[in-house]
Amino acid sequence: MAQLEKFLENVPTFDERGNYQCTVLVWQDAAKERFFAVVQDPRCNLVGKTPADFDGERVILADLFPVFVPGLDAIKRVDEALIIAEDYYVKRHIMAPCLVEHSPVANQMFKDTVAIEVEVCHKLMHLEIPNIAKFRGCVVHEGLIVALCFDKYAETLTQRVMRSASSLNKAKVMDRLRTAVSKLHDLGYCHNDINPANIMFASLSDDNPVLIDFDSAQRMGHDLLKVGTPGWCVEELRTSSQENDEIALRNLDEYLTSCGCR
């Protein structure tokens, strides 16, 4: 086995009743191969630990990640040198839940979730919408899309409200977000997970909100592959719907008012 480098995931998993099941560790070696181990420790402390301390099983990436297809309108392929030079944020989808289930259905759902996020972000990228996270392309390994690259942002709306709620112009924030969501709807997609953690700002002084995280996005009327955040979405809805986004925006407006935003 190649020299082990770093942990990528340390994720506790729970059943439908909220009972702890296990903790899944995922790591990557120098050859970019990924491995996972399941441990029975809800507080799994990795201080002083290395992947070599665990009996890992190789992750079959082809079971989980979509194929990168080059072409005229292809998704841009981003290499590590560019990621470092441009200081991009690299989003790696959390594999732990489907690794626990370890079924063809769970694997395909994970693969489809990655694929739809790439599809949505690629289409949005060409519209140059200032209030939607700037997608820069994908990290490709062995012909598979294993991560997405975006511009980095400084803090979430949750963090901004905790730090300086009174400095936020609620009307401006909501107007910009509604415009961004409207553009998404015009393309035939819904976000389905609008909440304060999925809204960011480019710097600590910037007041221009940016909508991020499109792994719950889906074409209107299609079944959701990943449901939104409880309390911010219509939890009983299992299809992609403008209603999900509209309710989330209303909840967001009320949230900002309750936090004392001007």
Model region roles, listed by residue range:
Residues 32-126:
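ATP-binding glycine-rich loop module of kinase domains
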Residues 154, 196, 216-218:
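Short, glycine/acidic-enriched loop or turn micro-motifs at the edges of active sites
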Residues 94, 112, 203-262:
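C-lobe/activation-segment region of protein kinase-like
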Residues 16-33:
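Short, hydrophobic/proline-enriched secondary-structure or compact coil segments at domain edges
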Residues 185-202:
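Catalytic-loop of the protein kinase fold
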Residues 169-183:
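Conserved alphaE helix
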Residues 89, 94-113, 122-125, 131-171:
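Conserved structural core of kinase catalytic domains
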